[in-house]
A protein has these predicted regions:
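Charge-dense, helix-prone N-terminal extensions
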Residues: 1-114
Length: 114
């Protein structure tokens, strides 16, 4: 069987940019590692990509009812770091992560923040 590889920051950014009318922003002047993905029209974030202590994290917005299901089903999905924990989740990006699920959650976050 093929060994699963970690998704990397560039792959996540590239996928986020496939969503219509989006752009990458680096809003934190003291932190060049963290990147937000935003809608061009309303400037709202739909993803926050962070590199903390050599670990990659992705924050996405989810429906609050779905958040509970995700957190109980996947140990790599936790309440969002430094954000509204009812609406946002952090995905710990490592080799255990389901790439298809990550892409679905990016799409949902994009739709929820339009």
């Amino acid at each position: 069987p093929l060994e699963k590889k970690d998704m990397n920051k560039e792959e996540i950014i590239k996928y986020c940019l496939t969503q219509e009318d989006t752009y990458k922003d680096c809003p934190f002047t003291d932190d060049f590692e963290s990147v937000t993905m935003k809608h061009k029209k309303n400037k709202k974030w739909f993803a926050l990509i962070m590199n903390v202590h050599n670990k990659l994290y992705l924050n996405v917005k989810t429906d609050p009812d779905y958040s509970d299901i995700l957190r109980s089903s996947y140990d790599y999905i936790i309440p969002a770091y430094h954000m509204n924990k009812e609406h946002w989740n952090t995905i710990i990006i490592d080799k255990n992560v389901d790439e298809t699920l990550v892409k679905e959650l990016i799409e949902q976050s994009y739709e929820l923040t339009k």
